[in-house]
Amino acid sequence: MSDVLFIEGGRVIDPASGVDGVRTVVIRDGKVAEVAERVERPRDARAVDARNRWVTPGFVDLHVHLREPGQEYKETVATGARAAVAGGFTAVCAMPNTKPVNDCAAVTELVLARAAAAGLARVYPVGAISRGSNGEELAEYGELKASGCVALSDDGRPVMSSALMRRALEYARAFGLPLTVHEEDLHLVGKGVMHEGAAATRLGLKGIPSQAEDVMVLRDIALVELTGGRLHVAHVSTAGAVRAIREAKRRGLPVTGEVTPHHLALTDDDVGASGYSTDFKMNPPLRSAEDVRACREGLADGTLDAIATDHAPHSAVEKDVEFDAAANGIVGLETAFSVCLGLVREGALTERRLVEALTVGPARAFGLPAGTLARGAAADVAVLDAAAEWTVDPARLHSKGRNTPWKGRRLAGRCTHTIVGGRIVHEEGKADR
C-alpha cells in the first residue's frame, strides 16, 4: 500500500497558514507534503473523501487529566488518548496531579511510554511547579524538561506563596518553560462549592466569589513583570481575569490564557436548572452570565489564546453524592468541538477563530510543534462534519468518565477522521484502530 494519503475536496481551514478554501491535503511519510486546489492522485494512493467537511490541523488541548499513574479507575493514558482522537485532538497536555505527582523524570517517562504504546494522540506531559504540588519546594525543572515536560503546573492547587511563585517564574524562565496556573485564593474560596451570587443563595450552597480568581491573576501578572517569566492562566472564568490578561498583553507581557467550553456555554443558573446535578460542579465553578460574556469576548478578540477542555474524568462513586461532597470536574474531549461550534452559530465566534483557538493558538502558547498544515509539518489532521447532529450518550463516550453536563443534549458537529503522523487513528463508524 502506498505511504501517501490524500484528503480530498474538503474546506481546509488553517489559520496558521492563512488558508481557507477547498483544497486537497497530500500527506507523505507522516508529513504534510502539499495543500493545493488541484492534485492528481495515483491509483494506489489512499484517500479520505472530505467533501462538505472541514479539514483542519489536529486540535491541541493544553489541559487534560489522564489520571495515570495512580487513578486508572478514572482514566488511563490510553483511554484518554482514545477520547482525544475521537474529538479531533491530536495533541494533549497531561496535567501532573497524578499519584504520585509528576514532579520527576520517572513519572514523565512512564506517561510518555504509555502514550507511545497507545499510538493515538501525542501526549505532552506537564510537570509540577513544586514537589508533590505541595507549594513548599520547587521541583527540578531541568530534569522535568529533559525528560519531556513542556510546561509546569500545580494544577488544582494554586501557588499560594508569592515568594515561591516568584522563584518558580525565575527558575522556569531559565529553561524556557511556561507556568500554567490554577488561579484562586483559597482564603476567599473557603468552603465554597459554586459561584457566589444569586443562584448560590437560592440553592443554599456556599459561594466562591469571582475575586478569588481575579486577585491571583493580578498577583501573578505583577510577578511576570518582575521576573520576565511566562505565565499561562488556566481555565479563565471571570470578567476580571479577562480584563487583567488583556491589559497584560497590551503592555507586552508574556501572558497567555485558556478558557473551557463549559465556561463559554454554561452559567451558574444551570446548577439549579439541572437539579443540583454534580455534572455541573467544577473548579473554577460555572460563573455568571456577565462572566460568560466576558470570556466569549476575550476568546473572540484574542485575549484568550486557546480553548482547553480541562478534561477531568471521575468515577460514579465520586460524582453520585451530594453536591457539596462531589468531586470537581467533567469530561470534555469528545464534546468540545460541538459545544464551541454552537458559539459560532450564535455569532459569538467566527469559524476561523474557533479553529485558531483549537489549533495554532494553544500550540503557540506552549511552543508545541503542532497546529498547522504547512508543508513539512507533522501530518496531524482533523476532518470535521460541521452539519452532523448527535445526541450525547455518556455510555458511548470513549473516556472512562461519564461525568458530562451535556448528557442527552442534541449537538451539532462531529469529528469523522483524525490523523496523527499520517496514520488514520479515528474514523467515525469504524471499530477502534
Curated annotation (Swiss-Prot):
Domain of life of the organism encoding this protein: Bacteria
Gene3D superfamilies in alphabetical order: Metal-dependent hydrolases, Urease, subunit C, domain 1
Residues that coordinate or bind Zn(2+) 2: D155, H182, H235
Chain residues that bind Zn(2+) 1: H63, H65, D155, D310
Manner of cofactor binding, per the entry note: Binds 2 Zn(2+) ions per subunit.
UniProt xrefs under NCBIfam families: pyrC_multi
Annotated protein name in UniProt: Dihydroorotase
Organism: Anaeromyxobacter sp. (strain K)
